């Protein structure tokens, strides 16, 4: 009898876990992937998991990728669930990305600029041809040629524009930014909170939204002022010391998108910025984030705000892939109680409708 | 009492529990009002009971006995999974008997056995906002609750009656709590709604993904929305349970073959089992 | 010379859980008196129930106002880590050993966010069930009787004003020795 099949949930779960472990390992005749290999050779997957898992730890992120069989949303979820149990010791000082040790830095708005353009490790000008040489186990590639480090500082492009008064000034605030991992979002959400949500948000969702602003759903005229990738120092001020000490480095990708702004009654026409910052090397995400950040400022800048990317609630409530995947996937949990109610209700409604038709 | 090493009793850290406990007390003080809380990522996915789990984790102690049901049954996989989670992280005894439990965490049902004082019913809630299909903007629904402006819902129900002759909501049927707040009872069948009214047990609702907690204190009026000429009517299959013969309990319809054969069984497995055992006892005597 | 700091909960996890369940039961069934177990020995003038309630609910996120004096403040700061505020209106939790601040001076929440209202813990001299005030409202089947000794004379007048502001309004926890009872903002209190 069908009824018996739903019994024994406990045993079914145990068996499913065992099967999952077997599938994860794959063919035991092949050597097992180490966490270090994932960390080193699937580094962009690790970066994405750190960004969306909102926890900077390459080793844990690599473990999550391995445990999740390469499912990056599942891996981000594992990392989040771990992160949430950690005690909160304090907050860091704001990162100074101006002092970044830059490995890549490009601007689309200036041909050359102080500090120069640094292409760095990028897919951008590769030809997307499958490299069958990689399929064979080979020697490591020869070391990349190193150019002498530029001594010149690398001022931010937005700073250069600001000097000329062309870039809207960002209000400076010493206020402690909100923390959406501790307080639920409330609307209207201020920009620090929005940026926090976007930085944790799903790359694919933000990519689609950013793209929509380029296609007329939101009036965007973006230029990449600058993208930079590199290491920045993390500093904290322990209360017992009273001054900042460095506790380590983070790899981050920052994108500053320059956008037109027509001006308002109180503000002259000028450029405004959209901002993106993500853990690790996550250029696509940083760019998409900066487009969406700018779109979300539409209302405060007095622009029309009708497009999906310009709606705070729409974007912020739906960009978190751990929330989204949970709720979408919960549809596979049993719903037969509700479905039974719907069945009975539908039978009742149809009976009423047919009776009326017959009369 | 053995618990998983490396984690606090009942998984959550004490700071998180305190934050949730403060939210629960305010929820009880304002019956039916949704209190936002700093919901944490749980080791189970959002939508799978994270709100209920956080509420249970914040109230449970070693003196408790926990029952977990999904669709009325103790043996559905998600109920098993959540019960195992608490057995592992809190080491509390669990039970399948409604009458023996001090805390019952549920998804989609209220047990058939009437609950009593001293028991707490914890609902897993996917969408805490009863108005969300009519007004998706949270900032706006917050305003409507502040003004107790529930015209949108009344219009919706009225339109149902105009079109179908009945209110077409069969589960998650909206209720008014203590005459003030419109509340989503979670996706329980409308059949269960009357059990919420003046229930002797405390009812707590946790929505993890939506980050809301709300409550109905004991003996509090919970009224299913209706109209004088179209009173609320809970729906139940017109059949008896094939196992225990109950004509009062809520039934699952089980398809037995591909020729239209079907049977009906109690959705509440504990209730059904108790009734079958009673019949066997009577027969043995 | 300062006294050595009195200890907090011996078992912070389980004692907080025990005290919270008493608070939850008290708030859910207004007028029912809960009795706390445990060996908490807070500094004077704190009584056991009030001290346990504060350790259970207060932390760095809850500004606390109290008139309990320096020893109690030092104890709270150390064991609960809560900020102490001078303005009753700025507090999320208040503990009054003497005359309580008047309810209109306290945070009562807003129509949209009534849950932001403060919780007022009042130390009283005695709490007894089955006699005294007649309480009714959510959490109460018909009526609960509660006798409270040691409240200011105008408490019921202030309470009626507080209740009339629903959904705004403060919630009160009454503590006497190791006993506690609660008055959520919904409860109707009648004399005799």
Where is each model-derived feature located?
Chain B
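Short cysteine-rich clusters marking metal-coordination/redox-active sites
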Residues: 241-245, 266
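Short linker/helix segments within small regulatory modules
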Residues: 253-263
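General detector of N-terminal leader/presequence modules that precede the first folded domain
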Residues: 1-182
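Short Cys/His-rich "knuckle" micro-motifs
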Residues: 248-254, 274-277
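A boundary/linker detector
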Residues: 162, 181, 185-216
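Short Cys/His-rich Zn2+-coordinating modules
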Residues: 217-231, 249-251
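Short metal-binding segments enriched for Cys and/or His
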Residues: 267-283
């Amino acid at each position: 009898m069908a009824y018996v099949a739903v019994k024994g949930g406990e045993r079914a779960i145990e068996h499913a876990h065992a099967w999952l472990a077997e599938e994860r390992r794959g063919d035991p005749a092949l050597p097992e992937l180490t966490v270090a290999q994932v960390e080193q050779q699937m580094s962009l997957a690790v970066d994405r998991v750190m960004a969306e898992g909102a926890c900077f730890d390459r080793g844990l992120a690599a473990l999550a990728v391995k445990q999740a069989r390469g499912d990056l949303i599942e891996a981000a979820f594992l990392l989040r669930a771990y992160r949430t149990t950690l005690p909160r010791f304090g907050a860091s000082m704001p990162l100074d990305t101006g002092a970044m040790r830059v490995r890549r830095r490009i601007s689309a708005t200036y041909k050359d600029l102080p500090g120069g353009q640094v292409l760095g490790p990028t897919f951008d000008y590769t030809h997307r041809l499958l490299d069958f040489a990689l399929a064979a186990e080979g020697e490591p590639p020869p070391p990349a040629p190193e150019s002498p480090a530029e001594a010149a500082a690398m001022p931010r492009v937005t700073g250069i524009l600001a000097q000329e008064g062309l870039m809207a000034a960002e209000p400076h605030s010493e206020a402690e930014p909100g923390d959406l991992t501790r307080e639920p979002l409330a609307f209207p959400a201020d920009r620090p909170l929005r940026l926090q949500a976007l930085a944790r948000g799903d790359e694919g969702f933000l990519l689609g939204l950013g793209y929509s602003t380029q296609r007329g759903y939101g009036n965007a005229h973006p230029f990449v002022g600058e993208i930079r990738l590199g290491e920045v120092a993390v500093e904290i001020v322990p209360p017992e010391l009273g001054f900042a000490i460095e506790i380590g480095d983070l790899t981050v990708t920052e994108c500053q998108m320059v956008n037109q702004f027509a001006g308002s009654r109180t503000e002259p026409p000028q450029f405004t910025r959209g901002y993106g910052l993500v853990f690790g090397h996550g250029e696509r995400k940083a760019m998409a984030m900066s487009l969406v950040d700018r779109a979300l400022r539409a209302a405060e800048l007095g622009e029309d705000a009708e497009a999906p990317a310009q709606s705070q609630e729409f974007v912020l409530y739906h960009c978190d892939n751990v929330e989204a995947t949970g709720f979408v996937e919960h549809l596979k949990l049993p719903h037969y109680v509700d479905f039974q109610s719907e069945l009975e209700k539908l039978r009742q409604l149809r009976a009423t409708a047919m009776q009326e038709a017959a009369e | 009492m053995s618990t998983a090493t490396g984690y606090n009793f009942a998984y959550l850290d004490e700071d998180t529990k305190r934050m949730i406990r403060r939210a629960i007390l305010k929820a009880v003080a304002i019956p039916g009002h949704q209190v936002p809380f700093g919901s944490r990522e749980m080791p189970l996915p959002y939508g799978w009971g994270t709100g209920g789990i956080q509420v249970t984790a914040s109230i449970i102690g070693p003196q408790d006995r926990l029952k977990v049901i999904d669709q009325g049954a103790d043996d559905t996989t998600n109920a098993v999974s959540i019960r195992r989670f608490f057995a592992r992280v809190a080491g509390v005894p669990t039970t399948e008997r409604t009458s023996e439990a001090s805390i019952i965490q549920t998804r989609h049902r209220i047990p058939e056995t009437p609950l009593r004082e001293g028991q707490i019913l914890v609902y897993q809630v996917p969408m805490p906002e009863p108005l969300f299909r009519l007004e998706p903007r949270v900032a706006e629904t917050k305003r409507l609750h502040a003004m107790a402006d529930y015209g949108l819902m009344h219009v919706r129900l009225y339109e149902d009656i105009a079109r179908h002759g009945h209110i077409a909501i069969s589960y998650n049927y909206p209720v008014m709590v203590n005459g003030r707040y419109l509340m989503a009872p979670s996706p329980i069948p409308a059949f269960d709604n009357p059990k919420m009214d003046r229930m002797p047990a405390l009812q707590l609702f946790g929505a993890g993904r939506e980050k809301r907690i709300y409550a109905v204190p004991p003996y509090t009026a919970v009224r299913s929305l209706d109209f004088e000429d179209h009173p609320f009517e809970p729906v139940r299959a017109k059949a008896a349970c094939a196992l225990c013969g109950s004509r009062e309990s809520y039934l699952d319809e089980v398809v037995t073959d591909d020729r239209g054969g079907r049977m009906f069984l109690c959705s509440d497995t504990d209730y059904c089992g108790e009734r079958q055992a009673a019949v066997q006892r009577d027969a043995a005597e | 010379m300062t006294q050595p700091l009195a200890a907090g909960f011996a078992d912070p996890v389980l004692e907080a859980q025990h005290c919270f369940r008493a608070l939850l039961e008290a708030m859910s069934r207004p007028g029912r008196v809960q009795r706390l177990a445990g060996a908490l020995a807070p500094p004077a003038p704190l009584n056991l129930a009030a001290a346990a309630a504060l350790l259970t609910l207060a932390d760095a996120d809850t500004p606390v106002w109290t008139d309990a004096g320096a020893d109690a403040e030092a104890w709270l700061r150390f064991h609960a880590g809560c900020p102490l505020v001078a303005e009753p209106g700025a507090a999320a939790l208040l503990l009054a050993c003497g005359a309580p601040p008047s309810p209109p001076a306290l945070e009562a929440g807003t129509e949209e966010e009534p849950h932001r209202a403060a919780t007022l813990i009042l130390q009283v001299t005695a709490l007894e069930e089955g006699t005294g005030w007649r309480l009714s409202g959510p959490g109460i089947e018909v009526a609960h009787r509660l006798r409270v000794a040691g409240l200011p004379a105008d408490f019921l007048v202030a309470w009626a004003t507080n209740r009339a502001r629903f959904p705004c309004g403060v919630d009160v926890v009454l503590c006497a020795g190791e006993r506690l009872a609660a008055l959520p903002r919904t409860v109707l209190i009648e004399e005799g």
